[in-house]
Amino acid sequence: MQQLGATRRYAASDLVGFLACEHLTQLDLRALDAGQAPAAADDEQMALVQAKGQAHEQAWLERLRARHPDLADVTRAGPDLAARLAATRAAMAAGAPVIYQAALCHGPYVGHADFLLRTECPSALGDYGYEALDTKLARSPRASFVLQLSFYAWLLEHAQGVAPRSMHVVLGSGRELALRVADYAHYLRQVLRRFEAAIAAEPAPPTYPEPCEHCPQCRWRVACEARRVADDHLSLVAGMSRQQARRLNAQGVATLAQLGA
């Protein structure tokens, strides 16, 4: 999420983060309210993963550019969001066969799809429309990919007047999967409702930095680890699951000191 002047913008990554850890969302909101940006610790492994992801995306870009020399590259519009949105709208109106790094917006939500692919399905644009495609390093599909692509499809629906039929992901193996947008539209609406309720709640709902699968890639992981150490949290016990910790909490055991007493 970003604060751009008086406007607060939310991206697909905010929805993915919210589903993984509601504490992450609250930390991001507090940082924006304080006019601060969350600081991520240096992580060579994450930097390597990001570099590999960019290389995978670039390889697919070159493959599509070889097929479609008139591919529209929105990155040429520069980093300004308004310029990228305008460049994307212009490329869609012109009927570009492929649009790279398309910027889409509806209300407070912004998305940057790796690619938009032209299809011959009529829309408000004319006798054609677009579907989103993202590249991912993983070798099998994940729920977060589906949520992200569903979000882009929803933004596309507002941009072209009709929902795209399919959304696509290219995995690290090079395999391309097509998913029906309609199969996941209800799921996205549920996530949006929950997310909007959480960010609008006054006072903010109480959350805690419980360890989860998202932690290794989270910008708040150092702060959360420090909080758990300061609290003598049960998650510091090797192999302690969240369910086991909850059972102990129900018995009045909330810290390592209490566990060892």
Question: What are these language model-derived features?
Answer:
Residues 121-128, 158-162:
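Secondary-structure transition/capping motifs at alpha-helix termini
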Residues 33, 227-238:
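Short cysteine/histidine-rich zinc-coordinating motifs and their immediately flanking basic loops
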Residues 1-125:
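Metal-dependent nuclease catalytic cores that hydrolyze phosphodiester bonds in DNA/RNA
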Residues 136, 140-143, 155-229:
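Metal-dependent nuclease catalytic regions and adjoining charged, substrate-binding loops involved
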Residues 231-232, 240-261:
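Accessory alpha-helical DNA-binding modules that contact the DNA backbone or grooves
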Residues 27-28, 113, 124-126, 143, ...:
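Short helix/loop capping segments that flank catalytic or ligand/cofactor-binding pockets
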Residues 101-103, 112-118, 127-139, 148, ...:
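Active-site ExK catalytic segment of metal-dependent nucleases
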